[in-house]
Each structure stands twice: as C-alpha cells, then as structure tokens.
Amino acid sequence: VAEEGVTTHLKNWLGREFGTEYAKTLLPVMQEHYRLAYIRKPEFMGNTREEERDPIYKKVKDLPWSEHTIRERLKDYAALSSVVEEVEVKLPAYRKDAYMQLVKYPVQAADQMNRKLLNAQLARHGKTDWEQSDTAFDSIASLTRRYNALQNGKWIHMMDFQPRKLPVFKRVAHETAVTPM
C-alpha cells in the first residue's frame, strides 16, 4: 500500500473484486463513505460515551450541528446509497454476496445509522417526523439480517444491529427537545 498509495490500492482492490468498470464508479463512493465516517463515525452519531460512569453520557442526544449541516450530511449519504443500489443491479450474480459484504452493507448501514440519529435530532426539534428515524432503525435491522443470511448463513451472527445493546444502536426514544437546535 505504501508504494502505490491508498487511493490506487483501493481502486485496484475494487477492480479485483468487482471489475474495473465498477471500480471507477465505486472508488469515489468508498472515498466519500470514509470521509463522512472520519468526520463522525456512525456509532458516535448519538453523542454518547459508553465508557463514562455518569448515566447522562449513555443517553442519545443532539450533536452540535446546524440543521443545514444535518440535511447536507443526509443528502450526501443518500447519494452514496443510490449509487450503491445502481451498481448492485448491474453486477453479475456471483459478485453480489461479496458486494453486500464489502460495499453495500458498510455504506448503507452507515447511511441508515445517520438517518436514524440525525432525523431523531430533527424530530426532537419538530423539523421532521419520527417515522424517518424509526424507518432507518428498521432498515438497519433488515440489512443486518440480509448480511447474516449471505451464503446460506455463512456469516450468521457476524453482524449485530445492536452491538452490546448500547443506547446508540436502539430505536431512538420519541422525545421533544427543550432547548433550541
């Protein structure tokens, strides 16, 4: 990797796994996925800190982001998810399980985790309805069931949509914010 660089390595890997024609499309998708995760990992979107003793840190709460920032991030993830779907339809059948494991699940689970928590933040402030957050939670569970069923259950229990039953991975409680965004 050091010799060729991360971008070339990723492009070559995508080409090897899914074909060079798809690598060109998937490279920017994966780069943007990693960029968004670098800003805030999906598991940190609930603004919780499990290691802390004080229970206040275990409660899902707002991020210090503006409504504009939240909506832009949701839009960015929606665009990635859309491309992931478009590529999956075109892939040959023998590549689809690997694609689900290596591209679709990571990108779309991150998308849905962001949707779940960011739409919950907007809903707490009356800027959207709770259904969007709840639907995202259900989508994460569905994606995870599909992942675990790959290859006749080869990877069963490999992924858990609620690891360690942490609050950030649960359905977000429908609450109203008392302070403005």
Question: Residues of each region from the PLM?
Answer:
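Substrate-binding groove of N-acetylhexosamine-processing glycoside hydrolases
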Residues: 1-181
